[in-house]
């Protein structure tokens, strides 16, 4: 358990978080290697099991083997649990075990829990964790119940399992699906492109899972009284709405000319929702225009919101960057939102995170392109999908060399643990300067 590591090694809470994710990934890979995990009853090569486990725990959805046709029922169940652990977070899952066992949680453990979900304070953290766990199970159950009639109609009783799996995968923004076959692998939700129930339920699960647990709490406590929400929830909801509607309009006019009416609108909406770390697709992405692929790369890098099941640099990071630019245009000293001033250190963190994701995205895509001899645009798409923990692909991931797949594994891992968590885990408070250096200016622009 992460708590034991914390006590014995005197690690910081951030180091516990990143080691916890690594431990679960390795354990999942070893389980997936077992013959019982595959349909053919063979030992799965370690690199394939590791890639799948990393993709599941990091709630990405990229795959080197088709989930529906390669993995057995046992293997699929393991993947679903890895997705659930990854979506909630390793520390949150460990907390659930502690709560269910009735064990007392120490102040150090509460502090780690606070950092794991970026809670503003330690007080009430156990109650909040309980709220998150109950809310997660309830939402996933409701999502599964809505999809059961559709999947049972198409797959019989197996449709119940498929509904549960896809509900967990959608809520956790993972993008794994069981719809592929030996003859038609990696199809995602393309066979349900015009099914309103599947489209709407999957979209709602993705959005709810991606807005963050603290936004849930605001909505739960204050219902639809937007003015009573915390500023973070206001920024998240406003940014999320803009990042759904504006790209949806773009996709509506840019693509899907072969569809008409409600089906075209549904496809455009789904394509606007899924790039922000979900990874499902209802159309062949390779057929999209270059402009649409560029838009999807941007959405994949932005991702979901803080303290959510989603990855990416986060909606708040993107919003703060825009607000900072707006403040500069207006010659304002302070960055403001909804009548509140935002601390300069938060803006600095947002800039750092955005730069980290951009560097990882570009370096990863460039390296894969050079090594594989593939078009840079396609490799950048896969890199953005990995570091944003999205799972959308142009179809090249299963064909990549092992070294390129290892690069994607690293990108998925770094994208899931988060920029600030990684920074704080590597650079402790001991590295802070005890004295401030003289101030000077430098010309920019």
What do the predicted segments below correspond to?
Residues 1-445:
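Membrane-proximal intracellular helices of multi-pass ion channels
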